[in-house]
Design a protein with these regions (language model features):
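Divalent metal-coordination and catalytic microenvironments
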Residues: 23, 51, 66, 81-82, ...
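Short, glycine/charged-enriched secondary-structure capping and boundary segments
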Residues: 33-37, 61-64, 92-94, 172-173, ...
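Acidic, His/Gly-enriched loop-helix segments that form or flank divalent-metal centers
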Residues: 124-222, 228-232, 244, 252-254
Length: 297
């Protein structure tokens, strides 16, 4: 088992505003809109809690933008998420990557090739792809490869997916730190609030489905993944922590892609209370017992 070996310590002052964003997934315009909405400034501590890349429209722009922010301001901290570790597959020249980027249009590697005007079909093997990336994007990929897995402060642990329930949380496997599903349904033994993304909060059972962050202070877990890109109705969340000696304050806000509309009439659904709630992908307890393939429309 590979445990977390890249842990960064952060000493926050008695008074501080901490802005935490996770699961950006290549949506550069949403990220900029969210930073503007929270009135982000250089005095804030900005923590990007993993998954800068993949699935969205411009992963390369997000990487470059956040990399620049972190180089200009020592109060910007960035963690790795599971979607950011594809750089390791590239460095190891894993042939699987060629199949991955041929099937997925919105990837960091495809963004890099597009930026260079290189057609994926002309690349003969993974070694050639690796050479192209190293020659043109070595600073970005080295930066991604060096990102820590967790950040620890006096009050908080920031990690992308979750912690194992072990006495010493630093013995958490890196795999679980980056990919653990539904951490809010589990427990941990760290005596600090653990802030995670990775698992869209709408996947957790609720009477009224919501993409807003969930703060469970009894479990000492705050989950902030708003399902951006992953969910059709998803949003990009920001957790705002006002750190103060006599007690912290917690707020959140979000941005999404949807146009603003005016509500002209209230409408109440007449539904059986027993039928309220939702089923959100992925819900592994549900398995299809019968099905068939349908042609794409």
């Amino acid at each position: 088992m590979v445990i977390i070996d890249k842990i960064k310590s952060l000493l926050l002052p008695a008074y501080a505003r901490v802005v935490v964003i996770s699961d950006i997934h290549g949506e550069i315009e949403l990220l900029k809109s969210l930073l503007e909405k929270v009135n982000y400034n250089r005095e804030d501590y900005l923590i990007i809690n993993g998954d800068l890349c993949e699935k969205g429209s411009n992963s390369l722009a997000v990487v470059k933008y956040i990399m620049e922010l972190s180089e200009e301001n020592p109060k910007v901290y960035v963690l790795e998420g599971n979607c950011d570790t594809l750089v390791e597959n590239l460095l190891e020249e894993d042939p699987w990557l060629l199949n991955y980027i041929s099937k997925r249009k919105n990837t960091l590697l495809n963004d890099c090739l597009k930026h260079l005007g290189v057609n994926m079909d002309t690349i003969r093997n993974i070694s050639e792809l690796n050479e192209i990336i190293k020659e043109n994007f070595s600073s970005e990929f080295n930066w991604l490869n060096d990102l820590p897995t967790a950040i620890e402060t006096d009050d908080f642990i920031f990690v992308h997916a979750g912690l194992d329930s072990v006495q010493d949380w630093k013995m958490t496997s890196r795999e679980n730190a980056l990919r653990m599903p539904s951490f809010l349904d589990k427990a941990h033994q760290a005596n600090k609030l653990v802030v995670v993304g990775h698992w869209p909060v709408i996947n957790y059972p609720a009477e009224i489905p919501s993409h807003n962050p969930i703060m469970d202070f009894d479990k000492k877990i705050i989950a902030i993944d708003g399902g951006n890109v992953i969910k059709e109705t998803g949003q990009l969340n920001a957790l705002i922590i006002n750190k103060m000696p006599l007690g912290n304050e917690y707020f959140y806000t979000y941005v999404d892609r949807f146009p603003k509309c005016e509500i002209i009439k209230d409408y109440k659904i007449k539904a059986d209370p027993k039928m309220t709630g939702s089923i959100s992908y992925p819900l592994f307890e549900i398995s299809p017992i019968e099905g068939e393939e349908f042609p794409e429309g």
